[in-house]
Amino acid sequence: MTSERSIIIGGGGFAGLALAIALRQGLGSQTPIIVADPALATRPSRDPRATAIVAACRRLFEVIGAWDGVAAKAQPILDMVITDSKLEDATRPVFLTFGGDVAPGEPFAHMVENGDLIESLTRCAEAAKIDLRATAVTSYDARPDGITVSLGDGTVIEGALLVAADGARSKLRERAGIVTHGWDYNQSGIVVTVGHERDHEGRAEEHFMPAGPFASLPLTGKRSSLVWTESRAEAARIVALGDDDFHRELEQRFGLHLGEIKALDKPRAFPLSYFVARSFIGERLALIGDAAHVIHPIAGQGLNLGLKDVAALAEVIVDAARLGIDVGQADVLERYQRWRRFDTMAMGLATNTLNFLFSNTSTLLRSLRDIGLGLVDRAPPLKNILIRQAAGLSGDVPRLLRGETL
């Protein structure tokens, strides 16, 4: 059943499903919530990537019930080390270490495999009786009094709001005429899961190299998820190598500090780019997740940034609905945009700056950044501020990210 109160979400990935579940909890069953995405019919082959879910976003997943499905498979990140070196350097001195919890017994992040997370969100959406449609939003007509949404299966839905959660190449954003500002890094992130002889003890490592960062992120068991950045051409060469040649490239970067290593799946390369939408809203339209922004993975904040959108938009919608306000009207959506766009721009600036500072061969820049890392390492109060910032717990934090229900 649909009505003028319906909220339609175009896109059934992490952000779209999380928003749907949060809205169901906050609005109850009287508001129809529809998620439309062809991928709901059959998920593609299991995503080989894993994601660092920061503490604030883990709290969101706990509130909406999705954390139970991944908790046993999630690996807490207990500490992190950062080095700055060239590929040929014999040693990699540690310039910065992070450790400790954001609250007693609460690590600042957990590593979760993407396949496990999407499965848990899908189960929660089904349990919440979200109207899941395995088809795309093909067009819509927004008016001052509502929005008419057409789906690929011929269904026409009357509603109050359409949410674009359809990824970086968002058709809904394009249909709204919302332009983006950004650029291609001419870099790719190589992703592969490795097994190793010794336990990582929950330690994440980020090695800054001239071509880009090489990150080793702990998974359950004696496994780690590697994300390493190379130029587009070099990444294509590396992923095309045979097993033995790839192992040599891997060992040269990873080292043997955890004993012998072995790739557990085929490496894949994902192109890296940056953009932010000029507006996060249109007439009866809100953009979330990759439809609104894509940033460099150097800080591991991409998905977390989208989940912050989810928490803010859900709170804005639920608060408006409880006051009897039309959730799709302009001033409601403006509140969401004011809340999220500055934080997104700030994170984009930070990741772009880090990528520039660390993905180069300048001796002067290397000296300056190493001095900076060393100073931060010797300033515990500053490190604590950075940890809380990275964990999503600083600034104007939405209720869901504080672990509170709507």
What are these regions (language model features)?
Residues 2-3, 73-175, 183-188, 243:
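Conserved N-terminal helical subregion
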Residues 46-87:
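N-terminal FAD cofactor-binding segment of flavoenzymes
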Residues 24-49:
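Glycine-rich FAD pyrophosphate-binding loop
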Residues 61, 148, 156, 161-267:
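Conserved FAD-binding catalytic core of PHBH/FMO-like flavoproteins
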Residues 2-13:
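Beta1/beta-strand and adjacent pyrophosphate-binding region of the FAD-binding site
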Residues 315-406:
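C-terminal helical "tail/cap" subdomain of flavin- and related membrane-associated enzymes
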